[in-house]
Structures are given as structure tokens and as C-alpha cells.
Amino acid sequence: MENREPKLKQAPYFRCEKGPNWVPVCQKCEACVLAWKIFATKEWFRRVNDISQRRFLVSILGQLNSLYLLQYFQNILETTQGKDFIYNRSRIKLSRKGGKEEEVVKSSLNQMLDKTVERKMKEILYWFGNSTHRTKANYTLLLLQMCDSNLLLTAANVIRVLFMKEWNSISGLHDDTPDVMFFPEKKYSGTQDTSYVSWAARPKPVSFPMSKHLGNKLGTENVDRETTEGKGESSLQCIHEMNRQIFGKGGMSRLGDDPCNLLLSLDHVQLLSSGYSKYRDFIRDLPLHLSKYILRMLDKHSLNRCIFVSQHWATLAQQVKVDQSMHSFIQNQISLLQVTKEEKQAYTGSYTRGIDPNYANKVSIPVPKIVDDGKRSRSKNQKWKLRTKTDYNLWNAYQNQETQLVQMEERNVFCGTYNIRVLSDTFDQNRIIHYNGGDLMAISSNRKIHLLDIMQTKELPIEFRGHAGSVRALFLSEEDNILLSGSYDLSIRYWDVKTGACVRIFYGHQGTITCLDVYKNRLVSGAKDGQVKEWDIETGKCLKTFKHKDPILAAKISETYIVSSCERGIVKVWHVVTAQLQKTLTGHEGAVKCLFFNEWHLVSGGADGLVMAWSMVGKYERCLMAFKHPKEVLQVSLLYLRVISACGDGKIRIYNFLNGNCLKVIKVDARGDPVLSFFYQGNRMVAHTDSNILVFQFENVKWQYSSDKNKVKKSKDKEEEREETSLGDEHSRSTIQGHSLKDSVSSKQEFSKSRVHLKQTKNLSSDDMETPVGEVSHPLQKLWKVPMTPDRFLLTISALQQAHNSEEFAYPHRPRPQVIDAWGPSIPYPRKVLSLKGKSVQHAVDQLRSSNLPTGVRQTNIPLEIQKLQPNLKKSLHSPRVQATVPQPSLIRPKVSDSLRGDEHLTSSIDGTMRRAGPLTSMQVIKPNRMLAPRGGTATLSPKKERPRFYTTLDPLRMNTGFMLMTVKEEKEFAEAKMKEYEASVSTKEVDPGKASKAAWIRKIKGLPIDNFMKEGKTAAPELGQNVFI
């Protein structure tokens, strides 16, 4: 019990009893000696340089050979690891006036002091090593009061290293170690896992190297500990023994061969002040390329934190930054070389792939159906099935869910042309901005906030000061005269925009403020402490608190809901009134950095490069749509069913929320810097990157809705039809001549003028005629809308023969006859269906003959001439040597007026009169109607190298060539008659002996069997037939 020390908490209250408290009288007691040593230390400690201060402080702490003393100072210096202490220590020290002169004077004084200070340090260390625990505690406390923030941090690191070394040494004691005593604290309880104790016996040192190289080096220098016997040994040997216990085998450091050298060297000081960790730095042991590969996976913020881990990590982090910047530069150069046509149009502001920047429409969008109790209703009898690429749209997103249609408006916002104005081109990684419409924008890069006039590109003289830390979140409402700022100092400040005064401060968060949002008089804030708080702006009170397990990155508020997201990738929807969690949305594989929601939908953007769309109705938690990005999404918004997103590749994209198509790509910065945020109001958009702030001014758009477009299109079609009708009437009046009756009649053919609008005829009596429904009207698209000119009208007749053979028209715009037949008649006549029930067929035929054509129909009679062609008869079937019934080819074309041609009259192959075709048939004799036509050249045929074609003369009257209704018996008889007619037309052909001989030789050469080859050895038998041999 002799080694037992009093409680150190009472050590500062020990004073000399022989004199007053402020002047030590006795110079022999412990309190007086301590006071004198403190006074002597103050004379030189604050005047020496930082290196000397650090050496002396670390040497003093190295003399603390008690575990209880180390724990006591470790608890005192625990506050140095706090956030406010670190921030205060990292602040830049502003130089005072005349700093250079003071540095020169201080350097000269240091040179004079260095000669005597080292001797004074060793004297105090010698005295400190022989002092009691109470004296060591008092002197150390007073010495720490003279240290600045950097020295206090060094002291905390050294004490932590010494404590861990001493604790590991105690845990390595052998079981037979005698005289082990400990003194637990007052709050000690047997249920605690660990208890810090003070050991009275000297423990056995255990090697604890700081690094592999140092451990091997120091391990060879360890010597056996010399044991002290009795009290006659000198104090120097005792101090040397103590230092060997602390530094010798512990692997920390050794003072050298001189036992009186108590002042540590700079290498030992740096080793002790570097800190201690029981974990091993595996990054340091890995090869350089693997270490850089691992650090390259971190984001930008985490990589900046790695710089403060150690010097080795700082070097690696700097190299990774340089590699990433060079890689991004190379990729940008490659992308500029490989830019496509669509991207060029997108970068220049034009829309691509036929996107209409004026498009607008009102569509019905499905949303989950909610029953009366607030729960969503599920649809029955629906099976899950795989969806194709075309099925990924909003209408097919709801599976196994009943929906209802809600009318919404869609527009192609920000898809037109724009102008760019640069507000700032200064590179600043710490800059944040906020713009909410109007002419002012809030900017902050440090603890101060400024306002920028967008129209004049000028910074206002008002400056907002008051934050103790850098500003991390801003919200500006110029209309409501509100400016809110969240800072690193854990506070939220409410500023007056006009005066710059701080109106109110909101306290409550325990982490850095990361996001702010306002709805009316309600404020929502998120911080790194994982809390989302709702505040009343007028009173400054916290109304509700919502919690996450990870730091909050985004938070939004509306009248009904509060939506928040965290670094884990979880999005939570809270109800404002009941403060209950409505639903939790999971799907992102990284941190969700931005949010936006309205009454029906919610969009979230994350570090995984996805923008996910969700439903805000009820508790439906499935993802509706996903929009892929090449890099992380930093800002997202939803406007008129268009998703606007800012990506880390330096581009703003506009997607169609309904089908996921990308409508527009806007390249904000040519360097490819990430688009940190964007804000829009009307036709103006503000984009923010690390290197600049840009304003995109889009053109004013007059939205054209689809219903208006249809009306305009119908009106245009009607106007075109009216113009075509009027033109057709005038053309028919000028080109068509009236009929003239004369005695001479020539061949004629009747044609009806095309593209004439007919009036519907009066229906026949219901007893005789029936008009089927749906066969009267045809769409306008089915009409043949090719304008009919005189030349085209004449060419129609010459193309009849080719149309009859190839079933194709000579016009490039008119469809084939099969298609026209499928469409039905181009003129909307009511189809007449004979009703012969109870009536004779002859009566119906007479009634049809007596019926006239509808009024308004004009008939044009055009005479035709038939010209027989004279082909080359040498290789033709019409040669006299060939007996065939193939008719001679002929050409049918309209007969041109003789008054316009000087040639001889063409003779018609048809003599007599022309028969006019009425509704059925008629034998009226009509006079030919001469038609004016331009001079046409005669058709020349080239029979050589061309396969002969066979033409049949068309029946100009078109009699018995239409559809005939027959019974089975009549059809059989008709087929037999046609067969007999064909057999009668085919006659036996005379065999040319020369050709037969040639063919026989050819067969002989090919090796084919020939029965009557050369007719050798055979006897002619003419009585049996011509060319018959026996």
C-alpha cells in the first residue's frame, strides 16, 4: 500500500501550507517546486519554435509510466477528436500586420534561445522523471494549457499510442507475476467488459512494432533489462530503467546509448505523434497499381477524405486524381471525334428524330385504384408474363394492379432552340447555388452568401454573414423575401433578402445540413445525422422528426407528403399530418442523391446512373419506369410528363415519361464537368457545374395540341378538295365538246371523266332496291387524288392494253387494281341490289334499262383507232411457214383530230357504227367526238433481241366480259364449250424436214434415244399416213 497514490482529480488543489496561494514561500515542498518549474517553463516554452515545443511535449508525455495517468489524460484530450475542434484547427491563420518583420525577429531570438533551451529541457525532464504521480499530473495539465490546437492533437495521439502499448504489455503478463495491484474508479462495476486499472508492479514488456521495417530494426537493438536492487542506485539509472520500459522493448523508440539523453529526437517524435491503430494498413502493403485500382473505385468526396488518412494514402489519392482527370480528358476528345449527326443536332439546340418542340397533348394516364379504406386494390385473374421491348411503357407498368385513368397534360418542354449566357466561368468545387425564378440567384462557396442579378450579371452588395462553418444548402424565394441556408456548423439560418439580417436560427440537427426545401410556411431539412426535420418558419420550432439509418442526401415537402432519401439508396415517403411512414421504395444500388415528386408520380436519381419513376398514389411500391444514364444522376425533375435529369457526364437529358424515349440531349460544358444542379422557371434554365454557371434562354413556344392539329388538317383537306373540284369543272368545260349527230358513225369508246364529285342519286323504292349499310362512304385516303391533265387523260387510253396484261397502271401514284377492288368504288354510289322475290327477271332488267345515270355525270365519247402491228416475220409465229391461230398484234389508241395532223387518215379496222354502253347495253348510233390532242410520235417496235408478245384485241363494247352468275350445270357446259373451241382452233402442223433432222442430230449428240433416226432400213407407208415408215 506504500505505492498507492491519491486520486488525481484532487491533485490541482494541493498547495504549500507555509505561504499564501499566489507566492510560494517554501522552496522544498512539492507544491513550491512545481510552481517554480511551471514559472520557468513559461519563460521559454511559448518563445521557441514549433519543433522544439513538440519535442519537449512528447518527451514529457513519454515519462508517464502509469496506465492510470495515461487513461486520465486520454479522457481529457478526447475532445480533440470532436468536430468543432478539428474544424477550428483546420482553419487558415491570417497573417498579422508586419508579419515578415516579426518572423525575422523571432528567428533571431530562436537562434539565441536554442543554445540554452535544450539544457533547460533536459533539466526539467530529469526532475519530471523523479517526481510523483501527483506532480506529473499537475505539471502535465499546466503544460497542456500552454499548447495550441495542433500541439493538443499531437498530445492526444501520443497518449493514445502509449496507452495501447501499456495495455498490451499488461495483457502479456505471466501468471506468476507477483504483487499486482490495481485501483478501480468509483464508477467501476463488475458487469463492465473492460476496466482501466493502475498497475503497481512493473509488467513484462511486450514488443509492439509500429511498422514492419521499424520492428525488425528495433528488434535487433533490444537489450536485457537491468534489475534494480535496493534504494542505493542513482536516480539516472532509475529514469533510464523507466524509459527502457516504455520505449525499449515496446518497439517505440530508444533514447540511445547515453542514459541521460531524455529529450527525444525528431524521428522518435514523428513516430509517436503519428497515432496508433490496432488495425493493419493493407493498402500500404499492396502493390502500387492495386492500391490505385482500389482507390479509383471511390467517389470524389471519399477520395478527398483519403488524403487525411496518412501520407502514403495522400500520395496515392493525388495520383488517382491525376489519372482520372487525364482519362476524362482523353474520353472527351474521343467523344468529340466520334460525335454523331444526332448528337451534333442535340448540342446545337435542334431537336432530333422528328421531335416536335411545339407538341402538346392531353392524355389519360393510369394510376393505381384506391378503395375506400385507403388500400390499393389488386386485379384478379392476371398472370405475370415477360414483356418485350415495346411493352415497356407506363400503360404496361402496372401488373396485377387495378388502375384508373387520370387526364394529364404532356409537352415537349425544353426541346426547342436556345441561347446560352455565361454568368460565371470561375472554377470552384465548393460552390453551391439556388435559383427559384425572378432575377436573383443565391451563391455561396464558404461561410458567406451572396446574391447575383441574372439579368445584369452583377453581384449585389448585400452579404450574408453569421455561419461558423461553410454553407452546404441554400433555398431562395425572392417572391417571399426568404433566404434559408444550412451549414457545417449544424445550424439553419433564416435571412431577410432585402436587408441581409439574420431573422431566425434553427437548432436541432447533430450533423451537417445537406438539403432544404420549403412549402408555404413549412421547412424540411435533412442532415448527415440521419434525421429529417419539419420546421415552422414563423416560429422556428421543430414540428416533426423522421429518421433514417444513414445520412440524408435529399428531402422534399408538399402539402401532404415528405419524401426523403439516404446514402443507402432507400426512399421513404412520410405523411405530413399523421407523421407515419407511408411506404419505403427500394431499387437503387447506390446513394439516392436527388428527388422530385408531384401529386401522382415520384422520380429519384442515384449514384448508380438510374432515374426511377414511382407512383405516389396509395402504397404501390413497384418501380414504373427506369431511365439509364452513363454516370451518376445529380439532379432530376418532372415537368409535363417529361423527365429532366442532370448527369455526371456534363449533359442534361429530357426523357418521355410515358415510353422512356430520350427526346433531347443538352451538353452543358465542353469539358465534360458534372452538372451539379439545374433550376428552371418558364423558358429559362440555370445550370451549375464546377467550372461555370450558365443560363439557357429557350425560345417562346406556342403549344399545338393534337386536337387542334386534327381540326386544322381537316380544314386544309376540305379546302384542297374544293380547289380540285373547281379546277376539274373548269377543265371539263374547256376540253370536252358537246355531242353532234351526223349520218356517218365511226368507232368510238365511252370513258367517264375521273375525279368528279358526284351527287348521290335518289334511292329506288324500298320494294325494288336495298342499300347495305357501311358500303356508301369511303375514307378520303382511298380516293385516287392524282390531278387529271389532258396529256395524262390521253395516256390513259394507251395504257389500257398494258394494264390488261400486267395488271398494273402506268401511273406511279395510283395503286394496283387489286387494291382498288378491295377499297371498293371510288365514287360513293349506293350499291344496288336486286330484289327479285315475287317478280320476274325481265321486269327488273327493263327497269334498269329505263333508269338514267345520276345527274351531274358527264360523258365523253372518244373515237379509237386500231392499228395492226407489222412485226419481223422471220422469227415470228405469224410467218407463212407457221400455221397458228394466234391473232395478229394490234395497237389501240385514241384517234386524233385530222385538223391538227397533216398525215393521211388512219383507217379503222372496225367498220360500221359504234355501240354505246348504257347501264346494261344499248345500240344507239352516236357521232364520233373529235378530241384535241398534241402531236404524238408513232410507236416503233424492236423485234430483235426481244421476246415476241401476243396481244388480243379488246372488245370495245365490253360485252359479256364482266361477272356472270352461273349454276353448276351452266358452268360445266361453259367449260366444255371453251375446251371444244380451243381444240378446234389447234390444227396439225407440218413438220419441217430440215428442222426435224437438226433436232435428231442434236438428240444423237446428247446420247438420247432416237427411233427413226435418218429412216435407214425402213419402208415408207404413205397409206398409213404422212411421213410414216415401217
From Swiss-Prot:
UniProt domain F-box: residue ranges: 280-329
Record's compositionally biased regions (Basic and acidic residues): 716-733
InterPro entries (alphabetical): F-box-like_dom_sf, F-box_dom, G-protein_beta_WD-40_rep, SCF_subunit_WD-repeat, WD40/YVTN_repeat-like_dom_sf, WD40_repeat_dom_sf, WD40_rpt
Pfam family of the protein (one): F-box
Keywords, in A-Z order: Coiled coil, Repeat, Ubl conjugation pathway, WD repeat
SUPFAM superfamilies with a match to the protein in the record: F-box domain, WD40 repeat-like
WD repeats: 466-505, 508-547, 549-584, 587-624, 626-667
Keyword Ribonucleoprotein: no
Coiled-coil annotated spans: 963-992
Any Gene Ontology biological process: tissue regeneration
Region: Disordered, residue numbers: 709-773
Top-level division of the source organism's lineage: Eukaryota
Residue spans of biased composition, Polar residues class: 734-749
Transmembrane spans: none
Known function: Probable substrate-recognition component of a SCF (SKP1-CUL1-F-box protein)-type E3 ubiquitin ligase complex which mediates the ubiquitination and subsequent proteasomal degradation of target proteins. Overexpression is leading to degradation of CBX5 and CBX1.
PANTHER family: F-BOX AND WD REPEAT DOMAIN CONTAINING PROTEIN 10B-RELATED, UBIQUITIN LIGASE SPECIFICITY FACTOR/HREP PROTEIN
Name the record gives this protein: F-box/WD repeat-containing protein 10
Species annotation: Mus musculus (Mouse)
Gene: Fbxw10
